[in-house]
Amino acid sequence: MVDSDPVEFPPENRRGQLFGKYEVGKLVGCGAFAKVYHGRSTATGQSVAIKVVSKQRLQKGGLNGNIQREIAIMHRLRHPSIVRLFEVLATKSKIFFVMEFAKGGELFAKVSKGRFCEDLSRRYFQQLISAVGYCHSRGIFHRDLKPENLLLDEKLDLKISDFGLSALTDQIRPDGLLHTLCGTPAYVAPEVLAKKGYDGAKIDIWSCGIILFVLNAGYLPFNDHNLMVMYRKIYKGEFRIPKWTSPDLRRLLTRLLDTNPQTRITIEEIIHDPWFKQGYDDRMSKFHLEDSDMKLPADETDSEMGARRMNAFDIISGSPGFNLSGLFGDARKYDRVERFVSAWTAERVVERLEEIVSAENLTVAKKETWGMKIEGQKGNFAMVVEINQLTDELVMIEVRKRQRAAASGRDLWTDTLRPFFVELVHESDQTDPEPTQVHTTS
């Protein structure tokens, strides 16, 4: 069922604007849990796509994990054939993905009008394999590749979108395989149907084979009105390649749609395939992030004081309802994590905190950015404080604490330190939207 709720605009903004940063235009797409609108940056005029997701529908559908993965994964990816995620905003009931706008629409809409020639099929397949290989090299498997998830930009170049079903390498079980049944029926690999575990890279390659077949033929290789009959065809690899297909493409399709994942062609082999190599720019397979997977853009890295400026991705990643620490952090080492928003400067917070911990005879080690590690009570207390610039006027202070009962019986956190952080909290107006959580606990 499609989410029929209207777009929720923060109350302090004019109707049709999102946090005063984006003008929200016409609806360009919708699904069971999200709607996508065309938008425009009020600062630059740049066109963006705004994907609006209902938190309530996610929670009812048990899909919080999907949205967490999509935020985490898209934030890490920088490739010309992958839709760019600019930022994530949120209110109490909605999450807003602000993404690159693909003006050309879905590849599915183009191919549904008729099959492509081999040269055009090859061009899109080259862009697809470049992006998929890039994801795999970073331990990310899409698991739901299909023409509906492939968009086109204004130059009609391909862009992969919708990473909601994607898997990370940390989801692989001890047998080295993934075990979650994912994907769209006609694109599902035979080993997924067998429910014995599968290699995420291999099933993406199978889906790429289905996509290439569709581009060349104009129809699906495995299709039947009876789902079980279709699954049997997939499992046995029963398909016919159109007679107009060239011998080189025929050989490549046969290797892509090999029902045995052990002998199925690999990304490296695809790149060296004779049909694939025609007109291929080798630079497309050599995209690297230069160790910047989780870095912010240059204008967001450091303020004049040196406190790191947070973007909305950092904020929503830290909110209790959508905690991404399992994907990135080591929060399990601490028994409590709290966040406070304050109008104090980072320098002032550090100076005052140093005075308090000095009076308590605690050991302090300063971090490179604005923050510190505090230890004391003969190893029974440890705390890490990090201060990040939220806006020009506000900072967010994250406190990670581990504490065991001290011999004195005194609770250092409850009696002394937490009251200090509560004191400096910036009290937000009651009508403010909720892109941040003020002094939250996870």
Swiss-Prot record:
Assigned EC number: 2.7.11.1
A GO biological process held by the record: response to heat
Residue ranges of every copy of the NAF domain listed in the record: 305-329
Keyword field: ATP-binding, Cytoplasm, Kinase, Manganese, Nucleotide-binding, Nucleus, Phosphoprotein, Serine/threonine-protein kinase, Transferase
Impact upon substituting L327A: No effect on binding to CBL2
Tissue expression profile of the protein: Predominant in roots, cauline leaves, and flowers. Ubiquitous with highest expression in 7-day-old seedlings and flower buds, followed by that in cauline leaves and young siliques.
Modified residues (Phosphothreonine): T180
Purpose: CIPK serine-threonine protein kinases interact with CBL proteins. Binding of a CBL protein to the regulatory NAF domain of CIPK protein lead to the activation of the kinase in a calcium-dependent manner.
Protein name: CBL-interacting serine/threonine-protein kinase 14
